[in-house]
Amino acid sequence: MGPASEVYGRKLPFFLGYVLFVLSQIPVALGHDAPTVLVFRFLGGVTSSVCPAITGGWLADFLLPAERGVAVAIFAATTLVGPSIGAITSQVQLQTAMGWRMTAWTTMILGIVSGVAGFIILPETYLPVVEQRHARKLRQETKDWALHSRLDEKPVSIREFLTKYLTLPISMLVSEPILLSMTIYISFTFGLIYLLFVAYPVSFVQERGYGAIDGTLPLLSICAGIIVGAFYASWSTLTTVKQKAASGNALVPEDRLHPMIVGAVSLAIGLLWFAWTSSPAISPWPQILAGIPIGVGVQVILLQSLAYLIDIYTTGAASAISGTMIVRSLVGGTFPLFAPQMYRKFGVSIAVLIIQ
């Protein structure tokens, strides 16, 4: 859908994917066999990836680089806080009479509410499509049928869309070293988060003896770190803009990379901290507090890398980010598959040191 947003506008592909994601929750909630649940979980994951893939291009349409940095900070924070909070709330819902099915119904209800609000509030921002609609309106009002937009001059056929635009994210990914290297780093960082989602229950529930719900509450420290990271990245962007303006220069994409160094160091420190304090013989508080530098590191890395790609590709950012989303989602989905065996074989401390 990322390439589709560069042909048909941002809004239509965005909400088409969104509606399909919401509808995919119904078979999950009502399914009585594993294949049904797994198939529609997969489809839900595919359709939900449309939103983050298109959001980058949407923000690039109407925000200046300085404003974009703050907006991306908020967006990136929500995409990371959501899974962390979801790991906690899902444990609460599992204790209800409906069990795991309640998580699907909750997702659907929240999706409907936020989707309706978003459809009403969010405008179309992709300039070629806005121009095309404006030209169509003027033709109707003036009866001057010669009025047309740039998009009208070279309409995209279905065949051209399937052969050129649909393959664009993959072709960009394999042909552009910057995009490929950034995608590898983003994907590995994203995978670490989902490995930690498995590590926390193992460490706090199985090893420290916490309850199912209490064992997920330490994830709130990661949420706190994510919020701190968002503030730091926003402050860094605004400070850099002021310094550049004072010297008569403009913000360049490479300026986004400097805070990533801080984020990488923070993530490494947090993982070491978490591993070294994971022994049940040690108070849980040091291990809980390790989530703060982990959250800061993950937030700053993912946020600044996303802002960097948006700055480079601007109107083509949706296609670039779509390729990144494919790899990132595959890594985030496959890492937890081997996590239980890894933690069982090596223990939390050694396993976290290995991935660090």
Swiss-Prot record:
Instruction: Give the transmembrane ranges.
Output: 12-32, 42-62, 69-89, 102-122, 178-198, 211-231, 257-277, 288-308, 320-340
Its membrane topology is listed as:
Multi-pass membrane protein
Q: GO molecular function, one example?
A: transmembrane transporter activity
Q: Which Pfam families match?
A: MFS_1
Q: GO biological process: any one?
A: xenobiotic transport
Q: Which UniProt keywords apply?
A: Membrane, Transmembrane, Transmembrane helix, Transport
Give the UniProt subcellular location, in the record's own words.
Answer: Membrane
Q: Which PROSITE patterns match?
A: MFS (PS50850), SUGAR_TRANSPORT_1 (PS00216)
What upregulates or represses it?
Expression is positively regulated by the azaterrilone A cluster-specific transcription factor tazR.
| A GO cellular component entry from the record | plasma membrane
Please state the protein's primary subcellular location: membrane
The UniProt function text for this chain reads:
MFS-type transporter; part of the gene cluster that mediates the biosynthesis of azaterrilone A and other azaphilones, a class of fungal metabolites characterized by a highly oxygenated pyrano-quinone bicyclic core and exhibiting a broad range of bioactivities.
Q: What family does the Swiss-Prot or TrEMBL record give for this protein?
A: Belongs to the major facilitator superfamily. CAR1 family.
What is the protein name given in its UniProt record? MFS-type transporter tazK
In its UniProt entry, the species of origin is given as: Aspergillus terreus (strain NIH 2624 / FGSC A1156)
Taxonomy-wise, where does this protein's organism fall, top ranks first? Eukaryota, Fungi, Dikarya, Ascomycota, Pezizomycotina
The gene from which this protein is expressed is tazK
